[in-house]
Amino acid sequence: RQRQMCIRDRLQPSQVRDSQLCTTLELGDRRLSTVEHLLAALAGCGLTHVHLEVDGGEVPLLDGSAQGWVEAIAEVGITPAGTPAASRPVLEGPVTLHRGNSVITATPAEQFTLVGMIDFPQAAIGRQQWTVALTPERFVAEIAPARTFGFREQVEQLRAAGLIQGGALDNALVCDGDHWVNPPLRFPDEPVRHKLLDLIGDLALVGFPRAQVLVYRGSHGLHTDLAAALADRSAVQL
């Protein structure tokens, strides 16, 4: 029987323990994986004070997007918090980080704006770019429904290793070269939108900065590197 995990303390980038395929946090003596879509939904909808209880060590993936969490939030509603939200990071100047041929840059700006760029050899994806000045309304309508995506060869490898049992097509878009195995897409540029969904969830660990964040070939590792840099008081004003 799995224990229930209660999360009452403020989350922070220093709790990240793994960011290879998803974002995994260390919470006391336990770890919680695949937190990014839930955190994106909470932060994207404007929630600042939330008490979470989780059974097991993984947040449910649902359909691979944040849509289910957004719908659940809308069902219960949002009420004003009794205490003020934490201050948002204010950059002193540009912050640029690299991982291999991937790069993320945060530049001071009045409004939190995201620019995502991806470039894949698979023709079904190719090069995509999308920009959004983030508001709760735009998050709900234009970002939350975007699903995670993967590639047919990855699914076959995972099945051969006995790691998944036929559920991949229910919680991810699967690309096979020049086509999608399980269409239709919710947006023509759904992959790059999902990359920004992941970025929002990872930056929720520190709070949305007053900045424009541009990311090329983003990953959870790169995103959480930026979150850690934003949490460094020598780089930003809090």
Please describe what each predicted stretch is.
Residues 1-4, 8-49, 53-238:
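C-terminal regulatory domains involved in ligand/effector binding and gene-expression control
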